[in-house]
Amino acid sequence: MSSNKINKKSIARIAAIQAIYQHMLRNNDNIDDIIENVLSFYRNDTSMTDSPIKISLTISHFKMLVKLVFENIDKIDEIISNHLVNDKNQNHIPILLQALLRSGICELLFFPDIPTKVIINEYTDIANDMLNDHEIGFVNSILDKIAHENKRFYDK
């Protein structure tokens, strides 16, 4: 019997999106409490006993990603706002899409050791599982533009 596994960093990214989303819904709950809440889900093996897929995450990547998002939230949100068209503001973007973009942009800006193409592909794949087709294209487009603007696209 073979064991299916999902990449631990991929799960860390999904968990980060969950934490960011939770923070946005709860109107600024303590980040450390939210991190622990999300981690408790992944530590609780009984919640996934029927799953044929082994799910675990890179805790250090998850924690660093969430903390960096909130330490740099103004910069990240400004970048998102600068990429909106037709006079839309960030309040018109669904919360889940905002959470995903915040996490992806944070990785592009503050995780230079991770290849840009990996970041863009990972967040596009995650978007594919969570968002509609228009939003998936939006995620891919924004992350690609930000990577080019920050001269990260051809780095690795």
UniProtKB/Swiss-Prot annotation:
Q: What is this protein called?
A: Transcription antitermination protein NusB
Please, which domain of life does this record's source organism belong to?
Answer: Bacteria
The entry assigns this protein to a family as follows:
Belongs to the NusB family.
In the UniProt record, the gene name given for this protein reads: nusB
Which Gene Ontology molecular function entries are recorded, alphabetically?
RNA binding
One GO BP annotation of this record: DNA-templated transcription termination
Instruction: Cite the InterPro entries for this sequence.
Output: NusB-like_sf (IPR035926), NusB_fam (IPR011605), NusB_RsmB_TIM44 (IPR006027)
Which Gene3D superfamilies does the record associate with it?
NusB-like (1.10.940.10)
Q: Which UniProt keywords apply?
A: RNA-binding, Transcription, Transcription antitermination, Transcription regulation
Q: What Pfam families would the database entry show?
A: NusB
GO terms for CC?
A: cytosol
The free-text function statement in the UniProt record for this protein reads: Involved in transcription antitermination. Required for transcription of ribosomal RNA (rRNA) genes. Binds specifically to the boxA antiterminator sequence of the ribosomal RNA (rrn) operons.
